[in-house]
Amino acid sequence: MNKDQIAVSLMCMDFLKIKEQLEVLNESVGMYHIDIMDGHFCKNITLSPDLIKSFKKVSKLPMDVHLMTTEPNDWIETVAEAGADIISVHAETINGDAYRIYNEIERLGCKRGLVLNPATTLESVKHYLNRVDLLTIMTVDCRIFRAAIY
């Protein structure tokens, strides 16, 4: 498999060894995946926009920032300014507002990502799927704490 097709999640890394781990991964992967959870859409709180800035100091690889948040509008500009290359939002949080959200992401100079939970159908997002640069299909529903993998 081409390393450009591999995105590694940074959520589970050892934060005491960020620099060392990124230096090793930089040689093996094509992109980083950064989960931002707000504690509302998902019952967890994870990485922050400040960490994106730190990651960017150690790596030039693209960073896909996955907004697992109830209100992605509240985060888009902040994560773009922090250094996101791709901003991925959940279909469940943008229906009815998808075109405006994707226009804002594009205006900020980022690529547009869409995330589907296992029960979300492609049919439900067909009207704006053509606006998406990256599609992520979840194997668990992040809204269910300790959910089973589908």
Predicted regions located by residue number:
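Conserved N-terminal beta1-alpha1 strand-loop-helix module at the mouth
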Residues: 1-88, 93-96, 100, 111-112, ...
